[in-house]
């Protein structure tokens, strides 16, 4: 049975035809029926399935719909049409640290995130040292996260999500975290998770990274499925299309 099943999925957004400067202006125009919208389809009738243990990349130019698809699979959004079925626990690495309480320390946020993911304190006690070790944040573990750099927040988020293992890891451009050495640590950890049977769904503009991590690539172009197959073949076709200006 597929671990991810996407059937005839479309995602529609309503975009305002004119820009409003303030929330008050937007509300007044909306109530007076003076605000008009254009329909925009980020995805149109996309279907595919992913088997347990597969490593799959979603590729495409900016605005192609790949990140929207990842958010639908992660349950962050719901499709306008069609269905998305996920048969397993998913760890979404879409906006690292988005679930943190900025007033709390790293220590407190580790336990908070663990609770959100359904793990009790005893479980998080067992994994706490590994999380902080990997994130390299022992010197700042009791400092409020609001004082962290964006890179430190991202490191903590990646460490929590990948230490507390899930069936599916859904990643959006996350290997740009920190310096080169930390990026390599992230890459190695993802390789370990793949070896352990975790299913990977990966969004990236780095074609070389896609080829290294993923055996399969799904190419989304202007909201449509344009290619699906071995990552090297699909990536080469995508690059060739970009070079032709398509």
Q: Predicted segments — roles?
A:
Residues 204-205:
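H-loop/switch region of ABC-family ATPase nucleotide-binding domains
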Residues 210-212:
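A short, surface-exposed alpha-helical micro-motif characterized by mixed small hydrophobic
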Residues 59-61:
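The feature captures the beta-strand-to-loop junction immediately N-terminal to the Walker
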Residues 222-223, 238:
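Conserved ABC ATPase "signature" C-loop
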Residues 2-42, 231-246:
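Pre-NBD coupling/linker segments of ABC/ABC-like ATPases
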Residues 24-31, 111, 123-140:
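Conserved ABC ATPase "signature" region
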